[in-house]
Structure formats: structure tokens, C-alpha cells
From Swiss-Prot:
Glycans are attached at N42, N73, N88, N101. Belongs to the early nodulin-like (ENODL) family. This is Early nodulin-like protein 17. It is a lipid-anchor; GPI-anchor. Residues 1-26 form the signal peptide. It is found in: Cell membrane. It comes from Arabidopsis thaliana.
Length: 172
């Protein structure tokens, strides 16, 4: 009986894992790719073509003794002014993450002078786009073929697999 319970549990878990999961995951961007957060890199070009969505992360790698990550307003961003940051994202390790948890424009710069060498990044964070609409399923009567098939196959498989397992295990 214990094997039967374990088998039922395994089958149910297999079905749950095989079920389609929403394709919504946060993405981690390493700022500057393999050049990281350093002077003389054009971060505007790095950000081009990327879509930043709510929940994504910006991962900064830098020398913590020479640089930092400050969030500022647009005016301070344009003038490389770090006197009144909105937020200091630096945690001291030189491996810091900015979580994009609001739909807004983020203006980030190095407040230790690196901004004048190009160490500034502006990203616009958007809401996730809606999932693509699936193709319409032809209905037969009031129940679609796919729904009817799923309603039939899941209960049948829940009982068929354990029965097959029992037969196979008795043969050995």
C-alpha cells in the first residue's frame, strides 16, 4: 500500500510540474555585461534594445573603493550631480543590485566622480506585457475538444499509471 501511495504522489507531482506555468520571471541584467560598472563605457548604448520590466534586477559589479550607485532625479542625472540622491543603492560589497520595483524612469550614476567618465545609466521600467493570446479552440457543442480530452486523460492516467506499475512490479 505504501508503494501505491508513493506512486500516486509521484504521478500527481509529475502532472503539476508538466502543467503550463506562466512565463513571467524577473530578468537579471549585469550592467555593462563583461565590462561591468566602469568609466569610459557608454551605458546608453548598453541599455539600447533592452526592455526593463517591473521586477527585473540591475546587477552592478565595481570597485567599491572607487565607485558607488546613486539614484538621482533627471536634472541631477544630466548634470552628474550626486549631492541629493533619491537613494544610495550601494551596499559596500561592489556587487550590488538595483531592484526595479516601480514603473518609472530610474536615473543612476556613480557619485564618486565616475559620472563624468560616463558612469550613468537611465532605464525606463514598464509593466509586463500581457501574455500572448492563444489561438481560439474550435468548440464542439459547449465543450472544446482540448478541455474534453484533458478532463478525460487526467483521471484515466491517475488510475492507469498505478495499475501499470503494480503489474510491472509483480512481474519482477
Amino acid at each position: 500500500m505504501a508503494r501505491f501511495t508513493v506512486l500516486i504522489t509521484a504521478v500527481v507531482l509529475a502532472f503539476l510540474m508538466a502543467a503550463p506555468m506562466p512565463g513571467v520571471t524577473a530578468k537579471k541584467y549585469t550592467v555593462g555585461e563583461n565590462k561591468f560598472w566602469n568609466p569610459n563605457i557608454n551605458y546608453t548604448i548598453w541599455a539600447q534594445g533592452k526592455h526593463f520590466y517591473l521586477g527585473d534586477w540591475l546587477y552592478f559589479v565595481f570597485d567599491r573603493n572607487q565607485h558607488n550607485i546613486l539614484e538621482v532625479n533627471k536634472t541631477d542625472y544630466e548634470g552628474c550631480i550626486a549631492d541629493h540622491p533619491i537613494r544610495n543603492w550601494t551596499r559596500g560589497a561592489g556587487r550590488d543590485i538595483v531592484t526595479l520595483n516601480q514603473t518609472k524612469h530610474y536615473y543612476l550614476l556613480d557619485g564618486k566622480g565616475g559620472c563624468y567618465g560616463g558612469m550613468k545609466l537611465s532605464v525606463k521600467v514598464e509593466k509586463l506585457p500581457p501574455p500572448p493570446k492563444s489561438a481560439p479552440v474550435k468548440n464542439i457543442g459547449s465543450v472544446s475538444m482540448v478541455t474534453g480530452l484533458a478532463q478525460f486523460m487526467i483521471p484515466v492516467s491517475l488510475f492507469a499509471f498505478p495499475a501499470m506499475w503494480d503489474v510491472i512490479s509483480r512481474m519482477w
